[in-house]
UniProtKB/Swiss-Prot annotation:
Modulates RecA activity. Gene3D superfamilies: Winged helix-like DNA-binding domain superfamily/Winged helix DNA-binding domain. Belongs to the RecX family. Keywords: Cytoplasm. It comes from Streptococcus pneumoniae (strain 70585). It comes from the Bacteria. This is Regulatory protein RecX. One of its GO terms (biological process) is regulation of DNA repair.
Length: 258
């Protein structure tokens, strides 16, 4: 077979043969096989050219995708599949990129966890989930998590939560709120409890009394219209308990208030 045409089409070249066959190839393919118009090639050579062209095209696509930010093997593989590249070629591209250090799931996991240590707010459980969704193996995730101590992250998050809720919630409700937020962010209950216990500032009793009397003013206006005496006291006790106040603080406040 003889090459009758080599014409550039955007990022690819159209190669036509004298038997009517056509295929798109990359510039790397032209250089590798020293292709030119009127060159004669065999069926076997054509197959090699087509395979390499798809490999070269796939690698170029992958490198373009990786040029914006680091990606995991799964992300690159899924990206290449969108372009209908043969699965075997995709695997070859991935292997080549891993060999050249363009793809490294271990380094990717380490970078994500390290960034979280410096400025993030996620615990190990949430990070594990996020990295697993990116296709990183459980063993790789666990290996990298072992390199980090999450107590400082938990403490940083606890301090931010304290500033947000202090003066707005009673002591028990504040503790529950902070610990719940920490566990939702991926910290274990024990780590969340330690972070809360290590907080420098705690809600003072005076603040709790101010909050409970403020809440009593609001709830008394609501319930005094329907109840009185013992029933009113019970209703107020229940609503204050649901808001996180200790029963001893509630009883003390009601003695003064009613």
């Amino acid at each position: 077979m003889k090459i009758t045409k080599l014409e550039k089409k955007k990022r690819l070249y159209l190669m036509e043969l004298d038997n009517g066959d056509k295929c798109y190839i990359t510039e790397d393919t032209i250089v590798r096989f020293m292709l030119s118009r009127d060159k004669v090639i065999s069926e076997e050579e054509l197959k090699e050219i087509q395979d390499f062209a798809q490999f070269s095209y796939g690698k170029n696509l992958a490198l373009y995708h990786l040029s914006f930010k680091a990606r995991t093997e799964k992300e690159v593989r899924e990206y290449l599949k969108k372009y209908d590249i043969d699965e075997n070629i995709v695997s070859q591209v991935i292997a080549n990129l891993k060999e050249d250090k363009w793809i490294n799931d271990g380094q990717y996991a380490y970078a994500i966890i390290n960034t979280n240590q410096l400025s993030g707010d996620k615990g190990p459980y949430v990070l594990t989930q996020k990295l697993a969704q990116k296709g990183i193996s459980k063993s790789t995730i666990e290996e990298n998590l072992k390199e980090f101590d999450f107590s400082e992250v938990a403490q940083r998050v606890a301090n931010k939560l304290l500033k947000k809720y202090e003066g707005k919630l009673p002591a028990r409700a504040l503790q529950d709120k902070i610990i719940q937020n920490l566990t939702n962010k991926g910290f274990s209950y024990s780590d969340a409890k330690i972070a809360f216990d290590d907080l420098d500032s705690q809600v003072e009793q005076e603040t709790t009394q101010e909050l409970i009397f403020k809440e009593l003013d609001k709830q008394y206006t609501k319930y005094a219209r329907k109840y009185e005496g013992y029933e009113l006291k019970q209703r107020l006790t229940q609503v204050l308990a649901r808001k996180g106040y200790d029963f001893s603080d509630i009883a003390s406040a009601l003695r003064e208030y009613l």
